[in-house]
């Protein structure tokens, strides 16, 4: 469980410049120093411990918690700690509709599985060099964007988000689906859109790592309390020739889930 020393050493108490703040965060601010808001760590540790228990209990019930963080300070930590606790993650780019249009996202993941099957059974070698090249490029894009959620068969039960301002679309989708949001909230954030907020710095790498680490520990603790086993490795449906042909044709045309202009 996180300690006050952990929070201080990781700089969790440093907020944004006083000119960049959300007035709704006033109750979480201890004071101001050299133009920077200082977050009240007494409140941080209280919210941290409460939220830790919420996440632990969710994991103990077998629930899925999706990790989200695409800013450069969060990319590595999101992936590392999501994998350590066996949870899905998004750390490349949030695609609009990733949760509210989950069926379409699952179709894109299926295309990734088709391409990988073609590589494994050698059928990709029967294509022209250009077709094979386009397929492999498509595979790389799919893995970058959807690799962290490829095994997520259903919508998550909860979302842990780093930087709710940057990830506002993910927050909006979770709110729309009434999916609980867990997140550190910096002095520029809106606490009203987060179900389980933890006041703290969401920019410093060490602070972000601490938040991710604690969430992973809570999940692993909860999982250890879970007695029933879940079959997380269900067999994939067999890939048909029609699916292979369809994916090849699509790879040769425009991407279905992201335009080149977004790159």
UniProtKB/Swiss-Prot annotation:
- Keyword terms of this UniProt record: Ribonucleoprotein, Ribosomal protein
Source species, domain of life: Bacteria
Database matches in SUPFAM superfamilies: Ribosomal protein S2 (SSF52313)
Concerning Gene3D superfamilies, the annotation shows: Glucose-6-phosphate isomerase like protein, domain 1, Helix hairpin bin
In the record, biological process GO terms are:
translation
InterPro entries in UniProt:
Ribosomal_uS2, Ribosomal_uS2_bac/mit/plastid, Ribosomal_uS2_CS, Ribosomal_uS2_flav_dom_sf
Q: Does the keyword NAD apply?
A: no
Q: Does the UniProt entry include the keyword Ribonucleoprotein? A: yes
Q: Which GO terms describe its molecular function?
A: structural constituent of ribosome
Q: Which PROSITE patterns match?
A: RIBOSOMAL_S2_1, RIBOSOMAL_S2_2
Q: Name one Pfam family in it.
A: Ribosomal_S2
Composition-biased stretches, type Acidic residues, lie in 228-240
Q: Which GO terms describe its cellular component?
A: cytosolic small ribosomal subunit
User: Could you tell me which residues belong to the region Disordered?
Assistant: 223-246
Q: Show the NCBIfam families listed in the entry.
A: rpsB_bact
Family, similarity comment: Belongs to the universal ribosomal protein uS2 family.
Name this polypeptide is given: Small ribosomal subunit protein uS2
- Species of origin reads Campylobacter curvus (strain 525.92)
Q: Taxonomic lineage of this organism? A: Bacteria, Pseudomonadati, Campylobacterota, Epsilonproteobacteria, Campylobacterales
